[in-house]
Amino acid sequence: MSETYDLYIIHGWTYTVEPWNRTLAILKEQGIRVKMLHVPGLTEPSKKVYEIEDYVKWADAEIPDGAIALGHSNGGRILLNLCSNKPGKLSNLILLDSAGVYEVSAKKKVVAGLAKIGKPLKKIPVVDKAFHRFTGTTDYSKAPENMKKTLVNMLESDKKLNLESVATPTFILWGKKDTTTPPRQATTIYEKLPHAELKFYANWTHAPYISDPEGLARALYNLVKKLQNRGAGK
């Protein structure tokens, strides 16, 4: 029988989960069993170009039914789509500075346009800045070609995501200092989800596991325990 965990995490657009180590270590010390999933193309090597449907299928296979799952940034986007497609999949969804809100912007058009050209790119400051804005990665020209195209697919998928269809009880944790997915996007998600709670944290950036690992661990511990007690009927 495979091991079960208290919390499953899908990380954001990163090629290493090492910055999560402090938060995960604290949760482990407190008795919370966490499974950090490695996203194909990011922390699990792959040359494939991914569509959101590919990531939804992957997440569905990796996370057992009835689990509590957290998605950070692009990981939140994946889980929102999973819950939209399979309403009864998760018992509870935790969104940490999540992606998934479509906003028309010149920067997105720049990234999308250049990625679709498919030609080798020179280092272009405006493109690097836009790429960093949506991924946290600073050099677009050095990103793997398949993941440049995958990023475009992820951004485009937000157009089709129907947040109102996400019926899973959702807890939205957001940093007020987040400049990648700004607080207004948290409010948008909160207002559209049928069953959601929203809490802002004054000192958190887009990556609370870096800006406040202890505070993030504390917030997650308290939330997971509350949900477990609620599920046990206590």
How should each PLM-predicted stretch be described?
Residues 71-75, 79:
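Gly/Ala-rich beta-loop-alpha elbow adjacent to hydrolase catalytic centers
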Residues 116-168:
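Conserved alpha/beta-hydrolase catalytic His-Asp/Glu region
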Residues 166, 172-174, 178:
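Short beta-strand/loop motif that positions the catalytic acidic residue
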Residues 204-213:
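Catalytic histidine-centered segment of alpha/beta-hydrolase-like enzymes
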